[in-house]
């Protein structure tokens, strides 16, 4: 595998030496607003942060308290991190007194479902759609699951790269068709190897008892209210976190764009008996958009998604079907509790090299048997990935072979290092090599992983809530102590004001009743 990857990199270097410079990235970082005691905030989305419906950089995810901070798309890692830092600085400067952003992926203190306010988006029809969709999630899965936070990493390559890579592979298909097929190749390898990201960057080995809300569990207890597993990397991505039994019946295919689109289309058009029993309205108000297996495509949970920016009135799968894949969205990353902005430069650079490795390596179609093995490997890594005896299953020369996690991780890192070297050669310096070196150190010494560091803190006297609250408040003080320049502060003030004007314009432009708008919204061309 490494030989073919190395050969492709060598051809790109020789024929198109700048092709790998054509990387584009964006980050969507979630964070729960909490009060001074560590309880989920009950306050409204702060007015100064603009309209959650229309602001380009600051919105809410599921709950009124769950902020989502969105960077512009950038070509440079430094620029990406600067944007994320600035958005955090502006947000922290405008939080209600006593509030901070929760540093952990697993939520703060909760008091049942009712303590989690569903996000509000105003009185426009689009705003109501977003709110009703979230009400539907509450009835289907409960609100507590929706209080989990993470980082989404968006990744794409420009047409200069794609033309170069198509030439290297001697492919003659239309460029967009080639891009979509190649992105699916990336996705398949990502699914095979994403357990490595959980090992390296998972940071949720423990949680507060209030998250379980009386559910059965097999977690160990530390002190009064902290629960966890000694070798877990990411309870957020385990069956305690994002779980969806109804969706387990979905066999989402990542082998071809057409079958992926069809499967999602069918799921958004197939009634599901349990959701039909919920009904669409109560007391004259909508409580879900429809009773289908998925209300809309976004309800489908996975560790990675193919994406295409939608046009006005267009649904995600319509955009994919019409114009193909534009970028991929990595969705399995925990917040880094040790970083004020939830991610680090080393992590971003590793992701660049890792995703290129997924793309440039051979990627056979995934059959049902391998799909089950992929899911089992992932669950093993999130629940006991740091155990010394943990083993995973991989496909080797048409046979499934069991082996140690660390051995397989080392083999993957050898390939990632090849891509890291090429990126360093193009960009200058050794920042990509350092990122891989950091990853290798974690593979050799599990105590260096963020999950181990978090577990050590919360299993030695401090509760999960106390430790995470202290980290959250420390990050808040760090960001407050380093305010934006007046010019950048004014930029975000104006963006907030413009978002309110945009939201008002949307509301005033509505010329349909909500019933008619919803019917139109759910109609696919």
Swiss-Prot record:
The record's GO CC annotations read: cytosol
Question: Keywords for this entry?
Answer: ATP-binding, Glutathione biosynthesis, Ligase, Nucleotide-binding
In which pathway is this protein known to take part? Answer: Sulfur metabolism; glutathione biosynthesis; glutathione from L-cysteine and L-glutamate: step 1/2
Q: Which reaction does it catalyse?
A: L-cysteine + L-glutamate + ATP = gamma-L-glutamyl-L-cysteine + ADP + phosphate + H(+)
**GO molecular function, a single term:** ATP binding
Q: Which InterPro entries match?
A: Gln_synth/guanido_kin_cat_dom (IPR014746), Glu_cys_ligase (IPR007370), Glut_cys_ligase (IPR006334)
Q: Which Pfam families match?
A: Glu_cys_ligase
EC numbers listed for it are 6.3.2.2
Q: Which family does it belong to?
A: Belongs to the glutamate--cysteine ligase type 1 family. Type 1 subfamily.
Q: Which HAMAP family match?
A: Glu_cys_ligase (MF_00578)
Q: What is this protein called?
A: Glutamate--cysteine ligase
Tell me what organism the protein belongs to.
Hahella chejuensis (strain KCTC 2396)
Taxonomic classification, please? Bacteria, Pseudomonadati, Pseudomonadota, Gammaproteobacteria, Oceanospirillales
Q: Which gene encodes it?
A: gshA
């Amino acid at each position: 595998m490494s030989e073919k990857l190395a050969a492709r990199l060598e051809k790109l270097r020789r024929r198109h030496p700048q092709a790998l410079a054509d990387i584009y990235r964006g980050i969507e970082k979630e964070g729960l607003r909490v009060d001074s005691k560590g309880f989920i905030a009950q306050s409204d989305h702060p007015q100064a942060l603009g309209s959650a419906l229309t602001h380009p950089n600051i919105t809410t995810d599921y709950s009124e308290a769950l902020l989502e901070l969105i960077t512009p798309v950038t070509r440079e890692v430094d620029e990406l991190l600067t944007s994320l830092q600035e958005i955090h600085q502006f947000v922290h400067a405008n939080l209600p007194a006593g509030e901070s952003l929760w540093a952990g992926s697993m939520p703060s203190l909760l008091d049942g479902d009712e303590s989690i306010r569903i996000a509000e988006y105003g009185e426009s029809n689009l705003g109501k759609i977003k709110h009703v969709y979230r009400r539907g999630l509450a009835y289907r899965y409960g609100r507590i699951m929706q209080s989990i936070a993470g980082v989404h990493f968006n990744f794409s390559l420009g047409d200069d790269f794609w033309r170069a890579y198509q030439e290297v592979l001697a492919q003659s298909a239309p460029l967009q068709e080639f891009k979509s097929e190649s992105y699916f190749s990336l996705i398949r390898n990502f699914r095979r190897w994403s357990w490595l990201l959980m090992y390296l960057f998972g940071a949720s080995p423990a949680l507060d008892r209030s998250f379980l809300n009386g559910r059965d569990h097999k977690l160990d207890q530390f002190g009064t209210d902290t629960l966890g597993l000694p070798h877990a990397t990411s309870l957020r991505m385990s069956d305690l976190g994002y779980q969806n039994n109804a969706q387990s019946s979905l066999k989402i295919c990542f082998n071809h764009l057409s079958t992926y689109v069809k499967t999602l289309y069918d799921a958004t058009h197939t009634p599901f008996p349990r959701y039909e029993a919920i009904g669409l309205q109560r007391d004259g108000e909508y409580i879900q958009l429809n009773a289908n297996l998925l209300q809309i495509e976004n309800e489908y949970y996975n560790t990675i998604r193919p994406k295409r920016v939608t046009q006005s009135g267009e649904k995600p799968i319509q955009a994919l079907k019409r114009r193909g894949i534009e970028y991929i969205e990595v969705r399995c990353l925990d917040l880094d509790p040790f970083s004020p902005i939830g991610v680090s430069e080393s992590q971003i650079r590793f992701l660049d090299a890792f995703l290129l490795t997924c793309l440039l390596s051979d990627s056979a179609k995934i059959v049902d048997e391998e799909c089950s093995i992929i899911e089992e490997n992932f669950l093993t890594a999130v629940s006991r990935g740091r155990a010394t005896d943990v083993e995973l299953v991989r496909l080797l020369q048409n046979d499934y072979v069991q082996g140690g996690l660390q051995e397989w991780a080392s083999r993957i890192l050898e390939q990632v290092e090849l891509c890291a070297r090429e990126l360093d050669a193009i960009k200058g310096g050794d920042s990509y090599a350092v990122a891989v070196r950091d990853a290798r150190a974690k593979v050799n010494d599990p105590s260096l992983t963020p999950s181990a560091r978090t577990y050590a803190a919360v299993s030695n006297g401090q509760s999960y809530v106390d430790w995470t609250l202290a980290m959250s408040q420390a990050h808040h003080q760090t960001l407050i102590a380093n305010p934006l320049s007046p010019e950048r502060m004014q930029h975000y003030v104006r963006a907030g004001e413009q978002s309110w004007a945009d939201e008002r314009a949307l509301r005033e432009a509505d010329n349909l009743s909500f019933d008619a708008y919803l019917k139109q919204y759910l109609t696919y061309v």
